[in-house]
Amino acid sequence: LRLKSNMKTEPYILYYSLDGFDQRKRNLDVLKKLADKFGLKVKFITPEWPCHKIGEDLRDVGPDDFLSLISNAEIVCTNSFHGTALSIKLGIPFYVLEEKNVKDERKRSILKQLDLEERIISSCDEVENIIDYHINFNGINIKLNKLMESSSLYLKKALCIGAEE
């Protein structure tokens, strides 16, 4: 699924982060390396950004534009659960940029359940090992659909129990 985009643009990496300034600044080297490796520009959606020369800083991005930017990205780089989940649901190649000691259980859980833990980049050196950023979403979508069915069943049971009391 690709959402319509009213902007004609060259392929890009979308970097979406709500982390603090220091963490985003550390991620800049990873983003530069990915951009150089795959010949892509970077579009940034962050609260604020240190000076950079590798892309475009986007401001005032509303919900429609946000979804369109993710859907039309060549690669999404994020540290956000929602950025990760949307990339998976929309079938967009992605990387989670975070340090090894970060324990965001929502992100880690979904990545583990879908066998996508290799999509975590913790250092600039790890970019060297990336040969192809594409993801085969066929098997992932099967697993994702099973997880969604299980969640739906759980919610239906929970709501029925609550309605009887």
What kind of feature is each model-predicted range?
Residues L1-E165:
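Active-site anion-handling motifs in enzyme catalytic cores
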